[in-house]
């Protein structure tokens, strides 16, 4: 008796997770990636603005 070995990637496409666990894993990864990108963006924005902060008082020219 022979069984045909099927690659798991051929059974379902990666864009359509079937189980809740797979969906949670994908959404969790997206959330972590988004958090990393957000933190990096904030860090870069802070680095850019830290040297150029000026106190603008009344009567100052913009």
Curated annotation (Swiss-Prot):
It comes from the Bacteria. Residues 1-24 are annotated as: Disordered. Residues 1-18 have a biased composition (Polar residues). This is Uncharacterized protein RC0115.
